[in-house]
Amino acid sequence: MIADINISEKSFGDKILMTNVKFSIDDGEKIGIVGRNGIGKSTLFNILSGSDKDFSGEIVFRRGVSVASTAQEHHNLADISVINYILNGLPEYASLSKIINEYPSFMGDNIRLINEYSEALDRFNQKDFYQIEEKIKRELGNFQLENVYNQPMESLSGGQKRLVEIIKIMHSNVHLALIYEPTNHMDYVAKQQFIDWVKSQAVSNVSMLIITHDRDVLGKVDRIIELKNGGSTSYSGNYDSYLKQNAMETSSGMVNFEQVERRITSLKQKVLDYQRLKEKSRNQSTIQRFKRLENSARDELSELEKREKPSFWIDKDSIEKLNYKTAARYEKFKSKNIRVNLRSSEARSKRVVASAKNATIGYSDKILLENINIDLRENEILELRGRNGAGKTTLIKALLNYGCDLHLADKNNLDNLPTVYDGELWINPDIRIGVYEQEISDKYLNLSLKNAIEQLYLDKNLPISDTKIRQLCSDYLFTSTDLDIPIMQLSGGQKARFQIISILANDPQLLILDEPTNHLDLPSIEELESALMRYSGAIIYVSHDNYFRQKLKGEVLALG
C-alpha cells in the first residue's frame, strides 16, 4: 500500500461535501474516480495533491512516495516555455538537474558533495534523462503540439494546456499520478496512445488515480471508486465490472431504503396511536407508559428522517436485466437525472437538411478540406471523423457560415471563419438548428445562469419567463443558488448542461454536436445518448467517445 485516505469531513461554507471518504491505494494500481458532477472529485484531488488542507481526516503516504498531478488551472506562468514547464514538473529530473548544474560551482574537494554529484550523474544517465527533451518533443508531436515546444505556456489554449499536463505526467516517473479528465480534447489517436501508456505502466508499478467519465479509459482500470452520498464506494475490476456490481448494490440499497421508508410510515402511525391512547387513558401510570412509547417512537423517527435519500443509478442495459419488482422499485427511487427533451414523435420526412458538393475549404489561402460531399436528410446521422486539425470544426463552421446565417461563438472575428474556395455548401433555410460548440459564446460568460438562459432565448426570438427558466434549471440539475452564478464560474459539467439547454431552445430539426460528452457525468451521458437515439431530426457530430459513437452510429465522413 502506498497511500491511505480517510476524509471524515470536507465542507464549503454550510455545504458538507464529504463525510466518509475512505480508501487505500496499492502499488501499481490503476483506479478510476467517478461520480456525479459537483460531487467532489476535483476537491478530492486538491486534497491528495496537498493544495487543499482545509478538511478533517488524514492522508497518509508511505515514506518516500512521490506524487504528481495534472494541474486543473494555470496561473502566474510568466514566460515559462512549454518544455521548461514539463521538465520542472518531473520531480526526479528537476532534483538531479539542480545537483548536476549547481554542484560544480561550489563542491570543491568536499567528498560528500562529490559523491552526491557522481551519484546524480549515474542516476541521470540510468533514467535516460539526457534524451528526455527529444522524447518530450516526439510526444508533443504525437499529440499534434510539435510547434509549441518553445512557446510560452500562457499562450496555449485550454485544450493544449491539458495535453501538456498529460505529457508531463507521462514522463514524471512518480509512484502516484493524479490525472484529471485526461482524454478531453484528445483525438482518437492521442487517446489510444494515452490508454496504451496506462496499460504499459503495469510493469513499472506506477499507481494512478484518474478522474474520468471516458468509458474507454475506465475499461482499462483495475478498480473504480465512486463518490456518492458523501462517501466513497470501491468496485473491483473495470467499467463493465463496475456496472454489474453497481446494479447489484443499488438493488440491495433500494430494498433497505424501502424498509426505512416503511419504518418511518409505521413510526408516524405509532406516534398518533400513542397520542390517542394517552388522551383516552385515565390511569396515570398508563399515561406515562404511552408517553414513553410516544417519545421513543419520535426519537427513532427523528433519526430516520435526518438520513438523506441515497443516490440510486443503474445503467440502462442493466435495468433491462432487472426483475419486474426491482425495476418498479428503481423507477420509484432512482436519482434525478437531466431531462433531454428532443422531438421524437413527429412524422419523419426524408427532406435534405444539409449538403456539400465538391467543396474546397480553408483559411487565408491555406486549403484544409477538398472534395467534400454531403447529402444529409432528416432522421439521418453523419459522423465527422479525423485527427485534431483534420478540419472537423472547420467544416462545421463553414456549413454554418456559408450554409445559413447562424451566430457562432467567434462570428465577430472574421479571421477565424473559414473560406469556401470552390464547390457548394448548403443548409435548408426552413429548418431550425441547434449547435453544441466546444466554447461558449463570450457574450454569455459574464452573465448569471438565469440571465444567460434569458438572453439565449431572446437571441433566438423565443418567449421566456422566470417560470420557464426555473423549470429548465430543474430539468438540468441546477439548484436555485446556481441561478446567480456567472457562466464562466460554472464547472465543466454545469457548462455542458447549459450548452444543452442552449441547443434545444428552438426545438431544432438539425443538431450539430462537437464533442458533446466532454465534462458530462455517466448518467448524463447515458440520458443524452438515449435522447439522441430517439431523435427524429438529423445529426452531424464529432466525438472520440467510442461508446457514444457505437450508440449513435451513422455514416462516417473521414477527414484528413
Region locations from a protein language model:
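Flexible nucleotide-interacting loop at or near the entrance of a catalytic core
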Residues: I114-E133, S251-I367
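ABC ATP-binding cassette signature C-motif
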Residues: M1-F257, K336-G560
